[in-house]
Amino acid sequence: MKKNPLFPQIKGIMHGGDYNPEQWLDRPDILEEDIRLMKQAGMTSATLGVFSWAVYEPREGEFHFDWLKDIMDRLYENGIYTILATPSGARPAWLDEKYPEALRVDSYGVRAHHGVRHNHCMSSPVYREKVRTVTDKLVSHVGNHPGLLMWHISNEFGGECYCPLCVNRFREYLADKFDHDISKLNHAWWTTFWSHTYNDFSQIEPPYQNGEYSIMGLNLEWKRFTTYNMTDYMKSEISFLREKTPSIPITTNFMTLYGGLDYHVMAKELDVISWDSYAPFHNDYESLWDTFAANAFSHAHMRSMKKGTPFMLMESAPGLVNWQPYNKLRRPGIHALESLQAVACGSDTVQYFQWRKGRGSFEQYHGAVVDHLGTNDTRIFKEVAALGRDLLKLTGVSGTIVPSKIAILYDWDIRWAVEDMKGLASSTKRYVETCVGFYKEFLKMGVDPDIISCDHDLQEYDVIVAPMLYLVKDGLGERLARFVKGGGQLLATYLTGYVNADTLCFLGGFPGDGLSEVFGIVSEEIDTLYPSDTNVVLFEDGRKGTVRDYAEVLRVGTASVLGSYTSDYYAEGAAVTVNRYGDGSAYYIAARLDMDALRPLFLEILKKAGIPTLDLPEGVEYHCRAGEGETYHFYLNTSDHVQTVSGVHGKNLLDNETVDGVLKLEKYKAAIVQVL
């Protein structure tokens, strides 16, 4: 595996964050102090211009960029590179006053007023024109600056717009998709139900809250269109920058598992994947390990969208945030641990929002490296500076990747369809939580799965895990069959193969699209359990597992039964099966079982695939990065006491000590062991 460092001009892992000097232009002393403190903290980059439009262009056609060039000059002179954002994430008041069509319309048909952010219409020609104008001026002033490292498109894309422009684009999108044949759309959406048949594409409206939202196909296509329209807007910014500065890479910052956009679609247009990580550490509903593991799922998801290339941790909070229900401070050591987790999972950067806390407005209490106190002797500043010194030791890690031969399917189409389906129990569907739960169980065994969409190349892997594969896209059934027939190990669960890409139920039995043959079973019924209901599955080896929420009743064909229900009318019926198919095996878990009961099954699957596991102490997380013959093992202790890990050999890059057999990990500490 060849190393592919994102920024070879930077030593170690890049260290930086959002910097907002436009808030301090009246305080040159603070701007000067910022440079001094950045160097002390080991900063090698700064993200500028995310919300600077009103300073760039305070009145229409009046531009001011000298201050920006001055800041970039000073940063570069002090060894700090610039990631420069296009300013489209928030608009100046003059734009909304003169061009109200740039404001979004909500799902009740009400147009927004000026304010907050992310409420611009992506279809608006005038908005696109004004963004291009200010970006053109920006490029002409600093596009050739030697310190310019990367373009950061807008900020945290999200939301949707129901204005007439977007409605018309939606109709055009549907007409193109269904070959301008309204009868095809009517069939795909099953509109004869409730007499909702359309005569023309002009009759179709998006799913307004006070309108039509009862058609599953409509709701899903609106979600897909929102991604299409957002991506089209993003591409308008990207294409302009690629024309003007072709050598500068481009990213935009994603938001963990945000439900409003299909990041797999957007990722195809970007050079590098980046995201903003704000895990709710120290909450009262899960262990610290669980919080870290859920965060690792998001990291794995981000890295998997650009296989073979590191991703970027674009934002994180060294102290706390100000928008969660409870904004608890990270305890000493946690910030460094979560930052090194990002590196362990494949990031080549550690970056923050924000460098310095502002004096007012919405994020004045959001965590920052420099607090309102403004000094370098706070706990958080000292922790950030110590981390900066550690990141300098990881030059060899930069550009390596996380090798994985196992993948979990996580797909926005499935998520949207499951969340919108009218059935089961709305409060216990938990598609995202189920995917994360499977990831956590493998992570406990020292196995770090990739997180991929259903469109990804399955042949890269030896094991595919497909939780709640409710919607089967065109061709996926055939691809999964080919994967198993060729020797792959496939694991699926209840609610697999119920509907096609239009949300129409398959006929002839679930799972559809040929998957019943692959798994050797047919699901005849699915039982939804009340929160107080349980069942029990008895496995062949005598162990038992508790069933909650959902239990399918199976008709077994060619599959072998590994576990059976013990109560209710489906007692002794199959609950867990395996089917030999070609050179591989297809496992089916028909009920929502506790993960402890499934662990032996997972170990069996991994053993068949030749994927090694580790016996890790509870609370210790493991990851691996490799490239060009070098291998780095990451061990993270999320527990509040000392842990030891056996079988570790190499050099710990953080303390330069040789490890020969037993690794000792202090509370909330990490070790990065290079194999010698």
Name what the model sees in each region.
Residues 1-45, 58, 73, 397:
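N-terminal carbohydrate-binding accessory modules
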Residues 11-15, 42-44, 76-82, 144-149, ...:
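Short, well-ordered coil/turn segments that N-cap beta-strands
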Residues 15-25, 51-66, 113-132, 154-161, ...:
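The substrate-binding groove and active-site-proximal loops of carbohydrate-active enzymes
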Residues 17, 38, 46, 75, ...:
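Conserved, mostly hydrophobic/aromatic
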Residues 24-40, 132-137, 255-265, 331-339:
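Short, acidic/polar
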Residues 32-40, 47-110, 139, 237-244, ...:
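Aromatic-lined substrate-binding rim segments of carbohydrate-active enzymes
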Residues 109-297:
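Polysaccharide-binding and catalytic clefts of secreted carbohydrate-active enzymes
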Residues 201-204, 235, 247, 267, ...:
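Carbohydrate-binding surfaces of carbohydrate-active enzymes
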